[in-house]
């Protein structure tokens, strides 16, 4: 039935988006080495409006444990420095007037454990999104029974949704395990 395929495609797309979202969130968790992605969530006050750091400066990694941030406008350097300090990322930015330099300290064992907890929480959030998508799709499929779809078709579609859920959950588990390994590798 055409409608069933639409619901299955929609569920697949939504689950892929949930994976992508979790990947993005996990990329923001720093693993001891410098990465421009670490600053994706930082918002800077740009003439009264909250603007992502990437839109007001370039973030580069000249060495594995250092980051340089060059503002597009010189007047923004102190504002960017303040935004980084306010983000409580554990960095001590040095402002030399033109460029902000940040040395990325190695992670302590305690900080690594905290980041693993954060990773697990993000992973659990992704799993909840996937289960919610499964539930919504199954609810829509059950409504089709009232609209004249056969029980066999709906049952098969529910099995496909469950297989899709299992597959997506396995991908999510692999992402989480890889991030945990990355965090705990000294």
Swiss-Prot record:
It holds the Pfam family RRF. Its main location: cytoplasm. One of its GO terms (molecular function) is ribosomal large subunit binding. The keyword Protein biosynthesis applies. Keywords: Cytoplasm, Protein biosynthesis. The keyword Cytoplasm applies. One of its GO terms (biological process) is translational termination. It is found in: Cytoplasm. GO terms for cellular component: cytoplasm. Responsible for the release of ribosomes from messenger RNA at the termination of protein biosynthesis. May increase the efficiency of translation by recycling ribosomes from one round of translation to another. Belongs to the RRF family. HAMAP family: RRF. This is Ribosome-recycling factor. The lineage of its organism: Bacteria, Pseudomonadati, Bacteroidota, Cytophagia, Cytophagales. The gene is frr.
């Amino acid at each position: 039935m055409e409608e069933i395929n639409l619901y299955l495609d929609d569920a697949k797309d939504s689950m892929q988006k949930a994976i992508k979202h979790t990947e993005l969130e996990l990329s923001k968790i720093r693993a001891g080495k410098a990465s421009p992605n670490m600053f994706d969530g930082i918002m800077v006050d740009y003439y009264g409006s909250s603007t992502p750091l990437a839109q007001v400066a370039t973030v580069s990694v000249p060495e594995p444990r250092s980051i340089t941030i060059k503002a597009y406008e010189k007047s923004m350097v102190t504002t960017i420095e303040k935004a980084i300090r306010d983000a409580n990322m554990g960095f001590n930015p040095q402002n030399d007037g033109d460029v902000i330099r940040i040395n990325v300290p190695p992670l302590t064992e305690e900080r690594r454990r905290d980041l693993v907890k954060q990773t697990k929480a993000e992973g659990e959030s992704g799993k909840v999104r996937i289960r919610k998508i499964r539930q919504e799709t199954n609810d829509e499929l059950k409504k089709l029974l009232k609209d004249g779809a056969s029980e066999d078709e709906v049952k098969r579609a529910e099995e496909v949704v469950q297989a899709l859920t299992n597959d997506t959950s396995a991908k999510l588990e692999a992402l989480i395990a890889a991030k945990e390994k990355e965090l705990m590798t000294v």
